[in-house]
A protein has these predicted regions:
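Non-ligating segments of multi-cofactor redox enzymes
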Residues: 1-507
Length: 507
């Protein structure tokens, strides 16, 4: 057993209001610069829908993640090393800019400087890549916002597998949900295996996956290898970039920017201990529907003295062990089992988990489409949302999702009985395998949690990872990553790089 610690995140989709504050603040901090205009390290999608980039979940098209071979081993879906090298100059699995969207701005100055006309002046769109006029905006990162667009296009959502989507199409307002997405910082990241340059690595001390900008050569195999399509190519610098989990803030014990600014307070951050020796075993199970339970099995109980002793021997510091004891992520994923990984069938063992939304169940119950099982709506009779959520979160296995939804409904029924009727009904908790105290704890964390309850982040011990004395005087003030400016001035063929300038409209 090799104990490692990871900063993990849980997002409670039951509280997400789709305001995109997380996306905008992340964009302003990390990707508001040349070459990354189209990139959103954090974006919020409306489901059902094909998402951003288009059909990112369709691995038959993009070949992201891992696949299990006949001998029981796993390899990246894009192929073994020889196939990666064979396609290194012509990658057939690479999304194009139109699969994301062509970033644009508007001729705002025309509004100020236009001469007097009979009609109001209009700010027309212009490409941020070429600087040319765009006649029509074709797509965007939230194009399907609130079920926007035709159902014929949104029905390509792969989570409709096994779902009667024709019935959903007739009643397409039956349910919708918001899905905020960011890099999963997986335990078994496919992007690390796909990179020919070895530029991507997973930090041992906190599990954050990063790209070494000095090693990156822009081969973009990582873009294909990532099944969540959360690595972006910077066309200006010639490097790949991704969500860095705001590691400078994490090291200081502060939450990520998206978590800090979340209006709905849906995000939770905490430490999870896991057995690094069992990662391959968990990712290689034969049945995809067993991957969720396999990942749970490698998480280690921070209350176990044997685990704590081994963690200390493996270099996990005391403040991290104390944080693991108070981790809200551990409580939701392991104690209450109401949080689930996004598409575990990709075999990457993702570490950003989601609490499924109750809105489809409550909407159906209020409209009389499903009955009540005692105090709670009958979750299992609502086939379409349940199967859809199972395809999204547990590789199609409905039982864990149904139990998680029932426990959240039980929490509501229990607290309603306690606060409105003044009756503490333990039978509600017992029906879903909990007790009254666990329901109270769930309510405290998931409904009214304080800041320090949602974000249990220990400070980093950088002194254990590098010798600062040896680095003295090696780097002055610089912009970018370390001593690297983050830009490559000559282009691929040696001539000076041409910066795109947005032309002014002259009248």
């Amino acid at each position: 057993m090799k104990v490692r610690a990871q900063i993990a995140m849980v997002l409670n989709l039951d509280k997400c209001i789709g305001c995109h504050t997380c996306s905008v603040t992340c964009k302003n901090v990390w990707t508001s610069r040349e070459g990354m205009e189209y990139a959103w390290f954090n974006n919020v999608e409306t489901k059902p829908g094909i998402g951003y980039p288009k059909e990112w979940e369709n691995q038959d098209r993009w070949n992201g993640g891992w696949r299990r071979k006949r001998n029981g081993k796993i390899e990246p879906r894009i192929g073994a090393k020889w196939r990666v090298l064979a396609n290194i100059f012509a990658n057939p699995d690479l999304p194009e800019i139109d699969d994301y969207y062509e970033p644009f701005t508007f001729d705002y100055q025309h509004l100020q400087k236009a001469p007097e006309l009979q009609a109001m002046p209009v700010a027309r769109p212009r490409s941020l890549i070429s600087g040319e006029r765009m006649e029509k905006i074709e797509w965007g990162p939230n194009w399907e916002e609130i079920l926007g667009g035709e159902f014929a296009k949104r029905s390509a959502d792969v989570n409709f597998d096994g779902v009667q989507k024709e019935i959903y199409g007739q009643f397409e307002n039956t349910f919708m949900m918001y899905l905020p997405r960011l890099c999963e910082h997986c335990l078994n990241p496919a992007c690390v295996a796909a990179c020919p340059s070895g530029a991507i690595y997973k930090r041992e001390e906190d599990g954050i996956v990063l790209i070494d900008q000095d090693k990156c050569r822009g081969w973009r195999m990582c873009v294909s290898g990532c099944p969540y399509k959360k690595i972006y190519y910077n066309w200006s610098s010639g490097k790949s970039e991704k969500c860095i989990f705001c590691f400078p803030r994490i090291e200081a014990g502060q939450p990520t920017v998206c978590s800090e600014t979340c209006v709905g307070r849906i995000r939770y951050l905490g430490v999870v201990l896991y057995d690094a020796d069992r990662i391959e075993e968990a990712a290689s199970v034969a049945d995809e529907q067993d991957l969720y339970e396999a990942q749970l099995s490698i998480f280690l109980d921070p209350n176990d003295p044997a685990v704590l002793d081994q963690a200390r021997a493996d270099g996990v510091t005391e403040n991290w062990l104390e944080a693991a004891l108070r981790s809200p992520v551990w409580k939701m994923a392991m104690d209450w089992k109401v949080a689930f990984p996004l598409h575990p069938e990709y075999r990457t063992l993702p570490m950003v988990w989601y609490v499924p939304p109750l809105s489809p169940i409550n909407a159906a119950a209020e409209s009389g489409k499903i009955g009540f099982d005692g105090e709670m709506p009958d979750v299992r009779s609502l086939r379409i949302p349940l199967q859809y959520l199972a395809n999204l979160l547990t590789a199609g296995e409905e039982e864990p999702v149904a139990l998680g939804l029932e426990r959240m409904l039980a929490m509501r029924a229990y607290m309603r009985s306690k606060t409105v009727d003044g009756v503490i009904d333990e039978s509600i908790a017992h029906r879903v395998g909990l007790d009254g105290q666990m329901i109270e704890d769930m309510y405290q964390i998931m409904a009214i949690a304080n800041y320090e309850d949602r974000f249990v982040i220990p400070t980093a011990h950088r002194e254990l990872d590098e010798d600062a004395f040896d680095l003295r005087g090696s780097c002055g003030f610089s912009f970018g990553n370390g001593c690297s400016g983050g830009t490559t001035e000559p282009n691929l063929f040696g001539s000076p790089k041409k910066h795109v300038k947005t032309p002014m409209e002259v009248r």
